[in-house]
Amino acid sequence: MKIRVPATSANLGPGFDSCGIALSAYLTINVLGESEFWEIQHTLGEEISTNEENLLIQTALKIAPELTPKVIRMVSDIPLARGLGSSSSVIVAGIELANRLAHLNLSPKEKVRLATEMEGHPDNVAPAILGDFVVASHVENQVYHVKHHFPMCDVIAFIPEEPLFTEKSRAVLPEKLAYKEAVAASSIANVMIAAILNGDLPLAGKMMEQDKWHETYRRSLVPHLKEIRRLTQQKGAYGSFLSGAGPTVLILSPEERTNEIVQSLEKLSTKASIQIFNIDQEGVQVF
């Protein structure tokens, strides 16, 4: 059995802790057979556990404690600690692993609820499960979500060499916003979502760059965002935003502008990689 989970990008600027998209980079796990102990085979680095302490197994055992140990191969081309949903992909894979091995027949809604409870917010896990563009809310232990088609475009990722861990990126956020500022932030997010639903990426991109919830406070941690935004605006991008907690910046681009934008970004920094993604429309898949 093979389980594949897409990378994700949360927030899209003003859709803080609510909006997310699935991307065409993947975590893949293969169940190879029975074993006396849980064993995870991977080449992802020493910091990733190879036994039952791995987040994949921890997640699966929370859902189905009776699971018997397996040998599992884990492969991922999702960069770690770069704001592309690497940990969320493992949680989603763990839920699907338990679902299949224990024959739980979980619905997509149940998977989103379980993943949100474990992750704390739905903006990454929901698109990882459902694919495409998802707007979600986690209020009073209830999870509400809507999936919709995201307009066609290229998604260019500017991925710095240095990681930025979510805990550090969240620590700079304020505990409160002034009421007037919160109203403005909410209205910007509303217009962004409506523009996406209408297929209007030029307007959606403008709203993505007007966020008031988090990007302002994270600028000191992601100094490259301002220059990327200036450069990509000049080259005809729809818009750019900090992916999740950063440090990756995503740029939405018309296909005909992508090569020129990528060339400009490559000149900007040698301490970053540039990748081009598509929107993954399927979410978690089992083969």
From Swiss-Prot:
Catalysed conversion reaction: L-homoserine + ATP = O-phospho-L-homoserine + ADP + H(+)
Keyword Chaperone attached: no
HAMAP family in the cross-refs: Homoser_kinase
PANTHER family in UniProt: HOMOSERINE KINASE, HOMOSERINE/4-DIPHOSPHOCYTIDYL-2-C-METHYL-D-ERYTHRITOL KINASE
Name of the molecule in the record: Homoserine kinase
GO terms, biological process: threonine biosynthetic process
Role description: Catalyzes the ATP-dependent phosphorylation of L-homoserine to L-homoserine phosphate.
Keywords: Amino-acid biosynthesis, ATP-binding, Cytoplasm, Kinase, Nucleotide-binding, Threonine biosynthesis, Transferase
Subcellular location: Cytoplasm
Organism: Enterococcus faecalis (strain ATCC 700802 / V583)
